[in-house]
A protein has these predicted regions:
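Bacterial N-terminal signal peptides
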Residues: 8-17
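Active-site-proximal alpha-helix that buttresses catalytic centers in soluble enzyme cores
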Residues: 22-297
Length: 297
């Protein structure tokens, strides 16, 4: 009788363990959308909020949570009564929602300082999830650059308010002093090498500077210039730097200057590209193919 009771307990525990394993196997997938963030309400609505909504509408079986990676933006918004989660807080939120699988998608363009911070955070918590998938920044490889150029070109051609085919196009990025800044030069070289000699790349805070861009503009001898933000969120940088400093300086040199008023995050093509990346990651974590290697293609 005693042996039978022991056997019954063993069978019961085995069934419980099997059930728990199946629950973990079929556990919920959490999607973490990581944005640098912005204090510009209108820009946030047109980019971050719009992408968040599209992701939630597309992946209805997943829990979707956003995070801001810039502490300064989080603090600034908090003073206005707008609460945004940090990456660690957002991950905790997904845990609370019962997510055993994690997909991390950022809207960062370059593999810079903020991406390194995100990598460390994901590596720190990946042991807490059965499966984790995270992809590289939007501009990482030559193919990424080609795709971005193609999408920007499509967006410009679709906008009837400008005629980019008759203008010198200047993509204006943020820029930094990190090695990731070299990506801007790669894009500029790629444009010239693959048939767009009237397209140029400059940065607000890195290389190539506005001085370098002016030299390139002078070489083409077309007085019509279109400034295009190479920024996920145009926001204050477009208002103060692109539509301000850059436009005014080039106008003073005799150029006829127009500004394309959309950041990359407002472009439907860019949003769809990001959703495609998320779909591939969700498929990987749900099928068990994700190997917890962070920041793959």
């Amino acid at each position: 009788m005693k042996k039978r009771n022991i056997l019954t307990i063993i069978i019961f525990l085995f069934c419980v363990a099997t059930s728990m394993a199946q629950n973990a196997e079929n556990g919920k997938t959490g999607i973490l959308l990581v944005h640098y963030g912005t204090s510009n309400d209108n820009s946030r609505m047109q980019t971050i909020d719009r992408l968040n909504a599209r992701v939630a509408e597309t992946f209805t079986d997943c829990a979707v949570v956003e995070a801001y990676s810039a502490p300064s933006v989080i603090k600034m918004l908090a003073k206005r009564g707008v609460r945004k989660l940090s990456v660690s807080q957002a991950i905790d939120s997904l845990k609370t929602l019962g997510c055993s699988k994690l997909v991390v998608q950022s809207t960062m363009l370059l593999d810079g300082v903020m991406t390194e911070i995100l990598k460390k955070e994901v590596n720190r918590v990946k042991k807490d999830f059965r499966s984790v998938s995270a992809v590289r920044p939007l501009l990482y490889s030559v193919d990424d650059c080609r795709m971005m150029i193609e999408m920007i070109n499509k967006s410009l051609l679709a906008d009837k308010s400008v005629d980019a085919t008759k203008m010198q196009v200047v993509l204006v990025g943020h820029g930094s002093d990190s090695p990731a800044n070299a990506m801007y030069s790669q894009i500029d070289y790629l444009l010239k090498a693959e048939g767009k000699p009237s397209w140029h790349v400059g940065t607000i805070e890195g290389f190539s500077t506005i001085d370098n861009v002016e030299k390139q503009l002078a070489g083409v001898r077309n007085p019509n210039v279109l400034l295009v933000p190479l920024l996920y969120i145009a926001g204050n940088h477009q208002k103060d730097d692109i539509d301000g400093v850059w436009k005014q300086r080039l106008q003073a040199k005799g150029y006829h200057v127009e500004v394309f008023g959309k950041g990359l995050g407002e472009m439907k093509e860019i949003q769809e590209m990001i959703i495609g990346k998320i779909a591939a990651q969700v498929k990987d974590v749900d099928s068990g193919k994700a190997n917890n290697a962070t920041f793959h293609k």
